[in-house]
A protein has these predicted regions:
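Solvent-exposed beta-strand/loop surfaces, strongest in extracytoplasmic domains of secreted
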Residues: 1-92
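A composition-driven surface/loop motif
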Residues: 91-437
Length: 437
């Protein structure tokens, strides 16, 4: 009688595996036909080690390694192919889904994945960090009093892929910029959606005495909103932020209630606002300006637009660009370039003051591509200048001409064309464009 051994085989479930450097230990299942003894080894233990008996892999570093299983013949089975292997690639990114506690991102870190727990994610002082397809969804629970992402000091954020960050409690922003005297810079080619709580900014500061430093956006597509009384980008309720600078990318900023789209929230303040490029759309839901100050004694510094395409609107008593409602203010408004479309839904000016508020001054030069400003509803409000019940605002100068009336017809202009239009209700639009030589 001739006894023939069985034909054995081994194979891994996956021919290749991709992991992140902070992922937990794992096993790629091995299918075995027969009763041979298997041992495992890693070609590069500086990337990952493997338990020789169980095949469980522990990630050590980043790079690529080959995990190999070797089986021996037995009395019952013979193995023509005695090895099986797979390639393991370890990405240097930090996988938020694998975190088991709070994490402070260090310089050079790439964050990715969806945060699975209610953990505080911060950026170390001075660190440059990439956000790559992250999702941080705050739960709006007072047990977790922090922002979706907190900058501990100066921070540089590069966005790639699609990213979404939401604060964990109503008083906290989606992204908390660093303290006063620091700068948060956002750039890249991806998208970022940042959502603050009821009393906080989307990007900036939180509620009641909170503050933050400067905010600079120079790339990517950034959508920032407050669920309530904060600015989309800037300060929260009764809070403050530093200067806001936008030089590139596409920016959408909005507040659903009394804050500005870009600027200050309710009873709040922010520094200078500068836009020199990109596509910017900013809106306030109720009594704040589209770009500028919020409601009830809020303030912002100078507003300067030198380029880009800017669309700013207030749905109620604030200006499109300028100050919000009720004792609010803004500094000097200067528009020297770009295409600007600003309008107020009710008692505010298109560019200037909100109802019962002020602006420092308005200067529009001949270097613009186009400026269009609309007042709606209240005939006392100007398209460019004073809102309803203005509190003694400063001078209005358009291409060197001092404007003293809401009924101005462009008299005195030499470098700009002036057009006026209305749909027959109380709205009024002024459009300024360069004269062609």
């Amino acid at each position: 009688m001739t006894v023939v051994k069985g034909e054995g085989s081994i194979s891994f479930a996956e021919a290749s595996v991709e992991k992140y450097k902070n992922d937990a230990a794992f096993t790629n299942p091995l299918t075995i036909v027969g009763d041979g003894v298997v041992t495992y080894e890693s070609s590069d233990p500086t990337v990952a080690t493997v338990n020789a008996t169980s095949g469980e892999v522990t990630i050590v570093g980043v790079g690529t390694t080959t995990i190999t299983a070797t089986i021996t013949d037995t009395d019952e089975y013979a193995y023509e192919k005695k090895t099986a292997s797979y390639e393991l690639s370890v990405d240097p990114a930090i996988n938020l889904a694998a975190l088991s506690g709070d994490y402070i991102a260090q310089n050079g870190d790439v964050l990715t994945g969806t945060l699975a727990g209610n953990y505080k994610i911060s950026i170390a002082a001075g660190a440059s960090v990439e956000l790559k397809d992250i999702t941080i969804n705050g739960v709006d629970d007072e047990a977790y009093k922090w922002a979706g992402l907190t900058c501990l000091y100066d921070a540089n954020i590069t966005i790639t892929g699609a990213n979404s960050v939401k604060g964990f409690y109503e008083d906290y922003p989606g992204i908390q910029a660093g303290p006063v005297g620091t700068t948060l810079t956002i750039s890249g080619t991806g998208s970022l959606t940042a959502t603050g709580g009821d009393d906080a900014a989307g990007i900036g500061s939180g509620y009641d005495g909170a503050s933050c430093g400067d905010i600079t956006i120079c790339g990517g597509t950034v959508t920032a909103s407050s669920a309530g009384y904060g600015a989309g980008i800037g300060s929260g309720y009764n809070a403050s932020s530093g200067a806001i600078t936008i030089s590139g990318g596409t920016v959408y900023a909005s507040s659903s209630m009394d804050g500005a789209g870009i600027g200050s929230g309710h009873k709040a303040s922010c520094g200078d606002i500068t836009i020199s490029g990109g596509m910017v759309t900013a809106s306030s839901g109720d009594w704040g300006a589209g770009i500028g100050s919020g409601f009830s004694g809020s303030s912002c510094g100078n507003i300067t637009i030198t380029g880009g395409t800017v669309n700013a609107s207030s749905s109620s008593y604030g200006a499109g660009i300028g100050s919000g409602f009720s004792g609010s203010s803004c500094g000097a408004i200067t528009i020297s370039g770009g295409t600007v479309n600003a309008n107020s839904g009710q008692y505010g000016a298109g560019i200037g003051s909100g109802s019962d508020s002020t602006f420092g001054s308005i200067t529009i030069t001949a270097g613009i591509t186009q400026v269009q400003a609309t007042r709606n509803y209240a005939t006392a409000a100007w398209p460019i200048g004073k809102g309803f019940s203005d509190n003694d605002s400063g001078a209005v100068s358009i291409a060197g001409v001092t404007v003293t009336s809401k009924d101005w017809d462009g008299t005195g202009l030499t470098d700009l064309n002036f057009a006026t239009s209305s749909t027959g209700s109380n709205n009024l639009t002024w459009t300024l464009t360069p004269k062609v030589p």
